Regions:
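Residue-level recognition of beta-strand termini and adjacent short loop/turns
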Residues: 98, 181-185
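Central antiparallel beta-sheet cores of small beta-barrel/beta-sandwich binding domains
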Residues: 74-176
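Short, low-complexity, disordered segments immediately C-terminal to signal peptides
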Residues: 20-36
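Edge beta-strand at a domain terminus
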Residues: 186, 191-212
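Sec-dependent N-terminal signal peptides
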Residues: 5-12
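N-terminal helix-cap/turn-to-beta initiation motif at the start of protein domains
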Residues: 55-72
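C-terminal motif of bacterial Sec signal peptides marking the signal peptidase cleavage site
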Residues: 15-16
Length: 212
């Protein structure tokens, strides 16, 4: 395992070195050159330990694993700030994968009378010291990507990221999600996005989950 990780690290460093050289070369041919960060070599022992630490699940992954199972969701949505709430029910099934490194979640429900399905992959990136997440569903063709930090006092993860705004072609909009782990059988997800009229952030969705 250690040899495999070291080999992977060596390949990545080789590719990165070539990229730095390429950036420097191409930059010299242009008037507006991009200043690249100086590459600092890392010895094999340090690189090997870094990859081992990066690949080893820890406490944050164990915390994610506690959410494994099936959850029933009570969903409330708002199409605009101060608008009439719409309610529906949903179901989410969470399962850790790749020896406890990632959690895949499959969601089913309805949106304005139409069947809704979505899937997320969530992980704790040991190198970034952040949670990372992706989301896809049958109501779009893009991928939402967010990163978040754990707040121990609130028992919550606050994710921030970008998602496609199809009403403004070629542009993304800011999105924020707060996952609160109330206890082992109750969780709440709050989602915030821009109001279509003002662009100001407001709560677009809230899902109260109860473990089945």
């Amino acid at each position: 395992m250690k040899n495999l990780l070291f080999a992977a690290a060596a390949v990545l460093m080789f590719v990165a070195c070539d990229k730095v050289k390429m950036d420097v070369k191409t930059g010299s041919d242009k008037t507006d050159s991009v200043v690249t960060e100086e590459w600092k070599p890392v010895d094999s022992a340090t690189a090997n330990k870094a990859w081992m630490d990066y690949a080893t699940p820890g406490d944050m992954q164990k915390m994610l694993a506690k959410s494994d199972g099936t959850w029933i969701g009570e969903t409330t949505m708002w199409m605009e700030n101060g608008g009439q709430p719409m309610t529906s029910k949903s179901e989410a099934t969470n399962k850790m994968m790749y020896d406890g490194r990632y959690q895949i979640s499959n969601h089913k429900g309805n949106f304005m009378g139409m069947p809704f399905e979505g899937m997320s992959i969530t992980a704790y990136d040991n190198a970034k010291k952040k949670f990372v997440s992706t989301w896809i569903d049958n109501m779009g063709t893009g991928i939402m990507q967010t990163e978040g930090v754990w707040n121990p006092s609130k028992k919550a993860i606050e994710f921030k990221g970008k998602m496609t705004d199809p009403t403004r072609p070629g542009k993304d909009c800011d999105v924020r999600e707060v996952y609160t782990f109330t206890d082992e059988t109750h969780q709440t997800m709050e989602m915030y996005g821009p109001d279509s009229k003002t662009g100001k952030e407001f709560k677009t969705m809230e899902i109260k989950f109860t473990k089945k």
